C-alpha cells in the first residue's frame, strides 16, 4: 500500500491528512436491549440503528415492536441508571456509553413500561 505524501514549502515530504487519518468507524450503531420488570420481551434483542437517529425515534420503533399503545409509557435506560434525553443521537450515546465486546462496540440499553430508576 502506497502512502500519500505532500511536499512542504521547505522541500520536505510529509504524509497527507488522508494517509494519517483514522479508518472510518462503522456507519451503524449496534444496540443490545434488555427488558426490566414486567416489560415485554423482544424476540430479537439486538438492533442496528443509524447514528443520526434520536432516542425519541428509537422509542417509537420500540413501541411498535413491543405493541405498546401511545397512552402507555415506555422508559429507556442506560447502565441501569438514567434515561437519555429524547433528542440525544445514537452517535453521542455510542461514543459515551458503548462497551467493547469481541472487537465490536455495543450500546446496551434497558427498557421498561414502569419507572425503574431515579
Curated annotation (Swiss-Prot):
Q: Where is this cross-link: Glycyl lysine isopeptide (Gly-Lys) (interchain with K-129 in atg-5)?
A: 118
Compositional bias segments (type: Low complexity)? 1-23
- Fetch the Pfam families from UniProt: APG12
Q: Where is this site: Required for interaction with lgg-2?
A: 87
Short motif LIR, span: 90-93
Q: Which GO terms describe its biological process?
A: autophagosome assembly; autophagosome maturation; autophagy; autophagy of mitochondrion; cellular response to toxic substance; determination of adult lifespan; glycophagy; macroautophagy
Which Gene3D superfamilies does this chain map to? Phosphatidylinositol 3-kinase Catalytic Subunit, Chain A, domain 1
Q: Which domain of life is it from?
A: Eukaryota
Q: Which GO terms of the cellular component aspect does the record hold?
A: Atg12-Atg5-Atg16 complex; autophagosome membrane; cytoplasm; cytosol; phagophore assembly site membrane; transferase complex
Instruction: Please provide the record's keywords in A-Z order.
Output: Autophagy, Isopeptide bond, Membrane, Ubl conjugation pathway
Region of interest (Disordered), ranges: 1-30
Molecular-function GO terms, alphabetical: protein tag activity
How does gene deletion manifest? RNAi-mediated knockdown causes no visible phenotype, but animals have a reduced lifespan. Accumulation of pgl-1-positive P granules in somatic cells. Reduced lgg-1-positive autophagosomes in seam cells. Delayed removal of paternal mitochondria in fertilized eggs. RNAi-mediated knockdown reduces autophagic degradation of membrane pore-forming toxin Cry5B.
Q: Does the keyword Membrane apply?
A: yes
State the compartments where it is located.
Preautophagosomal structure membrane
Q: Does the keyword Membrane apply?
A: yes
The annotated consequence of residue 87 to K reads: Abolishes the interaction with lgg-2
The record, for InterPro entries, names: Atg12, Ubiquitin-like_domsf
Q: What is the effect of changing residue 91 to K?
A: Abolishes the interaction with lgg-2
Instruction: Relate the assembly described in the record.
Output: Most likely a component of a complex at least containing atg-5, lgg-3/ATG12, atg-16.1 and/or atg-16.2. Interacts with atg-5. Interacts (via the LIR motif) with lgg-2; the interaction is direct.
Q: Which family does it belong to?
A: Belongs to the ATG12 family.
Task: Print the domain comment field.
Answer: The LIR motif (LC3-interacting region) is required for its interaction with lgg-2.
Record-given protein name? Ubiquitin-like protein atg-12
Give the originating organism: Caenorhabditis elegans
Q: What is the lineage of its organism?
A: Eukaryota, Metazoa, Ecdysozoa, Nematoda, Chromadorea
Amino acid at each position: 500500500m502506497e502512502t500519500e505524501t505532500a511536499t512542504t514549502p521547505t522541500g520536505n515530504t510529509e504524509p497527507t491528512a488522508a494517509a494519517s487519518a483514522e479508518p472510518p468507524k462503522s456507519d451503524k450503531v449496534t444496540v443490545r436491549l434488555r427488558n426490566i420488570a414486567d416489560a415485554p420481551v423482544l424476540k430479537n434483542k439486538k438492533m442496528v440503528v443509524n447514528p443520526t437517529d434520536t432516542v425519541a425515534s428509537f422509542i417509537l420503533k420500540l413501541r411498535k415492536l413491543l405493541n405498546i399503545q401511545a397512552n402507555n409509557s415506555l422508559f429507556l435506560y442506560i447502565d441501569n441508571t438514567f434515561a437519555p434525553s429524547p433528542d440525544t443521537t445514537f452517535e453521542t450515546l455510542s461514543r459515551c456509553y458503548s462497551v467493547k465486546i469481541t472487537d465490536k462496540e455495543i450500546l446496551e440499553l434497558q427498557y421498561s413500561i414502569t419507572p425503574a430508576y431515579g
